[in-house]
From Swiss-Prot:
Binding site for Mg(2+) 2: 1052
Stretches the record annotates as Phosphatidylglycerol lysyltransferase: 1-626
Keyword annotations from UniProtKB, A to Z: Aminoacyl-tRNA synthetase, Antibiotic resistance, ATP-binding, Cell membrane, Ligase, Lipid metabolism, Magnesium, Membrane, Metal-binding, Multifunctional enzyme, Nucleotide-binding, Transferase, Transmembrane, Transmembrane helix, Virulence
Record-stated family: In the N-terminal section; belongs to the LPG synthetase family. In the C-terminal section; belongs to the class-II aminoacyl-tRNA synthetase family.
Transmembrane segments: 43-63, 82-102, 109-129, 140-160, 177-197, 233-253, 575-595
Protein name in the entry: Lysylphosphatidylglycerol biosynthesis bifunctional protein LysX
Membrane topology category: Multi-pass membrane protein
Species for this entry: Mycobacterium leprae (strain TN)
CDD domains: LysRS_N
Subcellular location: Cell membrane
Lineage top rank: taxon: Bacteria
Molecular-function GO terms, alphabetical: ATP binding; lysine-tRNA ligase activity; magnesium ion binding; phosphatidylglycerol lysyltransferase activity; tRNA binding
Amino acid sequence: MTTVDASPGISRFEGISSRSVTVATICSGPCSGSRSHSRYHWVPAAAGWTVGVIATLSLIASVSPLIRWLIRVPREFINNYLFNFPDTSIAWSFVLALLAAALTTRKRIAWLLLLGNMVLAAVLNAVDMAANGNTPAETFGENLGFAVHVVAILLLVLSYREFWAKVRRGALFKAAAVLVAGDVIGILLSLGLVELFPGSLARQDRLPYVANRVVGFALADPDLFSGKPHVLLNAIFGLFGALALIMATIVLFQSQRADNALTGEDESAIRGLLELYGKNDSLGYFATRRDKSVIFAHNGRAAITYRVEIGVCLASGDPVGDPGAWPQAVDAWLELCQTYGWAPGVMGASSQGAQVFRRAGFNAIELGDEAILRTAVYKLSGPDMRGVRQAVTRARRAGLTVRIRRHSDISANEMADTIARADAWRDTEFERGFSMALGRLGDPADSDCLLVEAVDRDDHVVAILSLVPWGTTGVSLDVMRRSPQSPNGTIELMVSELALKGETLGIARISLNFTMFRAAFEQGAQLGAGPIARLWRGLLLFFSRWWQLETLYRSNIKYLPDWVPRYACYEDARLIPRVGVASVIAEGFLVLPFSRRGRVHTGHHPAVPARLAESGLLHHDGSTPDVSGLQTADVDLEVANSRIPEQVRVRLAKLKTLQLNGIDAYPVGHPPSHTVAQALDADDEGTVSISGRILRIRDYGGVLFAHVRDWSGEIQVLLDNLVLECCCIADFTAAIDLGDIVEMTGNMGFSKNGTRSLIVRNWRLIGKCLRPLPNKWKGLTDPEARVRTRYVDLAVNTESRNLIMARSCVLRSVREMLFAKGFVEVETPILQQIHGGATARPFATRINTYDMDLFLRIAPELYLKRLCIGGVERVFELGRAFRNEGVDFSHNPEFTLLEAYQAHADYLMWIDGCRELIQNAAEAANGTQTLMRPRIEGASGTANHLEPIDISGVWPVKTVYEAVSEALGECVDTSTELATLRKLSDAAHIPYWPHWDTGAVVLKLYEHLVENRTDQPTFYIDFPTSVSPLTRPHRSKPGVAERWDLVAWGIELGTAYSELTDPVEQRRRLHEQSLLAVGGNPEAMELDEDFLQAMEYAMPPTGGLGMGIDRLVMLITGRSIRETLPFPLAKPH
């Protein structure tokens, strides 16, 4: 039970807007997966409605003389010939109402009672029919009644299978004792009344008459008694009988709930599941509430807690346990609902839980949102937190301090005082809550719960919060109370202190109250909201006068929480009113006599699966079991194994056998004496030990051949029973599968066919492979599978290994050449406050500590230039860059980039430097200054093989305008008008934006007509100034910048600049770029004031180079970027 800070002592569950959801929806009748209906499926409902109508008329007639007089004739006919319908008997009305409800919900015991009644009535009618002296009217009535009874009996017998629902266990003897005692008291009281007001009733008939009215439901014929008392006494006598029945029913319902509530073993199992899987469910701990019942999935790895109210089975939030077993838990719950004839409904499911219920045939509607505080980002600063900040300040000025402790750190006396305060400050008689409240405070089993107290100057506690665990790093609000004398801002102070101290307490998330219709309040208050949204918000504000709809919304939103939606799930909307009432009862807004809310274990029938119960892991006191044992417990081997492929099951069985035999399948490693390549060249006399993965096995009985591969190569090993020292070949085949990693020791030799082999004397398993390798000849043929399981591809595919080695050779060659020229390698920040250094769309992230947006760098240029300003004359960085752009043959969002800067140099110097870097890298990877290109074969132009292309020597150099002019067949230079360039673009069908200048249009023409059509490596120099914001203007050619791009086979490999060192011009250009960024261009660079300030300290004339290493590896190997990267970004399955 909790209260919000709207006013002292307001209940957290004071209205349907409280955290405990009081609106749910259900399915009617049997649910998903229910048994098929026969042609008589309508009989239960028809019987229930018929009996229900009689019960209603009987009750009305018992209290209204007018109604009794109006229906006297049909009532007497029904009573005499069809069904018992006495003139006044409240007790009988109550019995019929219970029977009608039971028939409607298909209870088999109701079918049996109605069938017995019909059989008895038919027998009595048959006896009357056999008697002589009946009038024609009596004969007609008896014949009609007999026919009706026979038809009813036949329908009930034929519809037997439609009444499948059972009744839960209960204290029948105890309820019967209450009924007998109540009837005796009712008879005595009625006898006293009839002695005082006998009317015309004869003295000798008074006791039988009273007994008939109290116990016999007035079913005996009134003509059997001499005289009768006043008609008002008849109603009172029936009321005494009804009260006795009601008390007996209450006792039965109480015993049903108590007997079927959580047992200690049930709670222990739930706590174990929460320990393993509860980190994502903020309401998971409330599943341990002890007046709930529970149903487990058959494998014991998930459970649903629920409560039954007026025939509605309300599931409380998400299933608890392994999300993979949630569907099995839902199936078990629906089967239980069907067994007892309950209508299922779900209250407060999360998005993930609602999806599971939806797949089971339910629909979902959003009820509201749960407020979640993230302690890492919570702060009191900022304009949006002004209200909370002021409230906290007021509370602190009033002398309040906050004390935070675990329940386990609180003494018994202090906890007793805390419980007393919570009860005293509660403004309702009973504790409320069901789906989002624990219903107990200070229980020893809840030692991990957190208690937050507000203490005044006199050390008096004026408010308390109690929060239950949410995984290991979160807490969820359970109790919120404050004294009526507490100062304003008390709750804000407590919540803020808890959030601000979250890191110290190990708390990352705080779940606060639940807010109904939060979206309606927000959307209705927005500027420009439609009339329907405003009307809906107005209605909610109107009802907030009685229920805390807006109050809870306002009390939560001021903390700026994350809103997490919660849902109600249903199958059939026809029973929504009934489920609404059931929800109100479950949450405690409507307190029925049998709604006892237990704090101790009262259940007598554990719901945990038998195998789990017999494992001995669970505790009778409900405490958390040994989680490691629970995790490895073989609860249901068949169900667990049904999801594992056959080959994996076989390998797991082998692993288990090895473990039982004391063999460690994953031992500590010892370096082998030789690699495979070294072993092949080793002397036959020496002992050789190798280790590697088994790729192939050929067993010939006494001799076995296997192929073992390590990083250096592949070797054949030979196992001979005559040579093996410690075991035989049968032991090897029993333990080893393809893919296992083994250690082999022996001598080098030759097989009979002359193959160089290792003759094994001893072997050892050092890594058991639990999944089979792909086809030994084809390997992984699916390109996506090769990307997603690169580790498997490397294990079986030599080509993939060669690509890894080629990439390593390229990186080493580039570094060594730069080192040889006196360059210094540095590392600059990857997380940057401003995205700059290139025009590209960045990846954005956020640092919680500083509450600041950051970007993954798109280039290290601006930081490297800072180093140049500082005097590092030759500097380079070889590292990762990130650009949030497309993914294709030559692009990956994460890539390796080389940037190098040399003082007292220009862009022309880097032409030879870049060419030498690439030629040396190609020689390091391929052995010669060649790169690999696909060879086109056949008329279809299919590229089947790679062929080397010589790239030695000097590469051609062209200006951009010269290359564009050649492609267009018309001269273009810096003086060409924009209109002319647009006409040329239109003629070449190249698109452009209307706001582009001449430089941008020329660049677009270059990209389409020149870059995409270039084959041999070519340097294109002198780009338009407007598209090179960081480049120095050309020293002699106006309108162009000293920049070149290296292009080969349609791919840009690198670029170099004569760097712009004029700080005034640099500021002007970056300012123009920042205006583009403000205007919505996501690729434009932002203004970096720190960099501009550094430039004002003067940078020496510098030439800079940028080169994509991934594309360089692509060029040298002839492969796509996804093939050359060990782990390229892949879309999720």
